[in-house]
Amino acid sequence: MKEKIKLSGVPETMLQTIYARAKESGGRGTIHDTKAEEIVGKLDYDFTLAEKDTAMHSGVIARTIVLDRLTKAWLSAHPGAVVVNIACGLDTRCYRMKGFCHWYNLDLPETMAVREKLLPESGTISQIAMSAMDDWGGEIKEQNAPVLVVIEGLTMYLSEADVQRIFAVIAKRFCQATVFVETMNPMVVKRFKEKSIDANNAKFTWGVKNGEALAELLTDFRFVEEHSLCEGMAVFAPVYKVLDKLSIVRNISNKLIVLEKV
């Protein structure tokens, strides 16, 4: 019997993103996410809008390609690390990665209740049912391991104060940490809508120009580098290899920003 899921607002967007990954994995195959395929097959949910929303699909897949590459490389250089995946939704990256000692998936209680049904996790993969703005640091048991925090698909639904609060929680808990955080350009926040996301009453509310501008808002973190989602788009749409060289395209593309705690 299929699982009927009832969510609304930002939490419901996780159903759109996992559908995009499942569809790509079972179709064109630029990513391989068998867990996503399994989960979508278990759900009683109308994915009609997600099926038609090509912009959302392309963005999710591009982001997955780039973040998988960055995470794999970081874990290779930091064996035995702790990973905290903030706003995890139904993300399945923990099943595609190796080399970590403990992976924590964190999201709102209503979201984690759904995840627990579909992806019951234990051992080296744990679930934390808390807001990203709550003081969740005490849930992380390891003391001296390298730390990677991933914040994917979240900041564009928050306020500047919310984003600063999340980084304050990270800074309070960890002496050293690397953060991969996805951001949206402010111009895109004001003008762009994804059909399937908008239908869930989830609205884009905040953006930042680039990684250097983000670091200026944070007292305990320094900017390391940033990656445009065009890098991921180029994998399945080669024209983006050219477009990515144009500053106007890079500027409006979502960024994956790398920061380190100082």
Question: Where do the protein language model's features map onto the residues?
Answer:
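Rossmann-like AdoMet
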Residues: 1-84, 88-130, 143
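Short amphipathic alpha-helix with an adjacent loop that forms part of the alpha/beta core around
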Residues: 135-144
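A conserved beta-strand element that flanks and buttresses the S-adenosyl-L-methionine
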Residues: 149-150
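A short, conserved alpha-helix within the catalytic core of class I
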Residues: 157-170
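Conserved beta-strand signature within the Rossmann-like core of class I S-adenosyl-L-methionine
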Residues: 173-186
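Short, glycine-/aromatic-enriched active-site segment of Class I SAM-dependent methyltransferases
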Residues: 186-202
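Short alpha-helix
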Residues: 201-231
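Core SAM-dependent methyltransferase catalytic element
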Residues: 237-262
